[in-house]
Structures are given as C-alpha cells and as structure tokens.
Amino acid sequence: MFLGTYTPKLDDKGRLTLPAKFREDLAGGLMVTKGQDHSLAVYPKEEFAARARKAAAVSRTNPEARAFIRNLAASADEQRPDGQGRITLSAAHRTYAGLTKECVVIGSVDFLEIWDAQAWAAYQEETEAAFSAAEDDVLGGLL
C-alpha cells in the first residue's frame, strides 16, 4: 500500500528518487502516466496492466472512453528504478506536470502521484475545506 507524503528533488537529468519504502514494491517495474489534476501517476506494472485491461473492456463507441484510453496508453512510460531507486521522467511528463526541482510524491493507496511542490500546495489549499465534508459522500459511511 502506498501512503504518505515525500519531497524528493528532480535532478538536472530529469531523474527522481523514489521513496525508499516503496522501492521493493516497484522493483519489478512500473508505469508512469499522466494523472489527474496535472500530476503524474506511478503504478506497479501489474496494477497498471489490470487497470488497462479494465479500460479496454469499456465500449470504444463511447467518445469519453476512447479519449481516456488513448491518453492513458499514449502517455504510459515503462520504467525500472536504477540501483539508487531513481526513475527518469520524460520531458513530456515533466512538462505536463509542470515539474521543477522541488517535487512531492504522495501515496494514493494503490499508486503514487508525482506533483510539482507548488502545484501540490495550491491543490491542498484549494481542496482542504471540502476534505472533511466529503468523507461521507466519498466513503459512504464505510469507516
């Protein structure tokens, strides 16, 4: 399970060091793709494959489904962390997420998100008020 908030730096070659506690779960390979809200999503390879199969099962006659599948597949980049736990983020991914040197990696239960630090701070400020109010709507009283 991927939980927590981490603040690695992006180096001049576009490499990001993954949090040490997640490296074992990602050692077999991972997929980086566009995420929501101009973040990047990092999935263990098997999790990404399962999600891709579910997406592919949706009718391609639905224009929104086609667009989602195209964007998901076209932006996917397979990576394997190096010996220091680093992955290289493509220029296209760095541009999409507006990444600068200061990054934030957050755990989102079954995947990671990579954010530009300023974008993450702005997102948190924007959504903080709705966070507690959304618990019942999102979780439906499961907790």
Swiss-Prot record:
Xref: Gene3D superfamilies: Transcriptional regulator MraZ domain (3.40.1550.20)
Alphabetical UniProt keywords: Cytoplasm, DNA-binding, Repeat, Transcription, Transcription regulation
Domain SpoVT-AbrB intervals: 5-47, 76-119
Location(s) in or outside the cell: Cytoplasm, Nucleoid
Keyword DNA-binding: yes
GO MF terms, alphabetically ordered: DNA-binding transcription factor activity; transcription cis-regulatory region binding
SS bonds (residue pairs): none
Main localization of the protein described in the UniProt heading: cytoplasm
Pfam families in UniProt: MraZ (PF02381)
One GO CC annotation: cytoplasm
One example of a Gene Ontology biological process annotation: negative regulation of DNA-templated transcription initiation
Complex and partners: Forms oligomers.
Family: Belongs to the MraZ family.
Protein's recorded name: Transcriptional regulator MraZ
Organism: Corynebacterium glutamicum (strain ATCC 13032 / DSM 20300 / JCM 1318 / BCRC 11384 / CCUG 27702 / LMG 3730 / NBRC 12168 / NCIMB 10025 / NRRL B-2784 / 534)
Lineage, uppermost ranks: Bacteria, Bacillati, Actinomycetota, Actinomycetes, Mycobacteriales
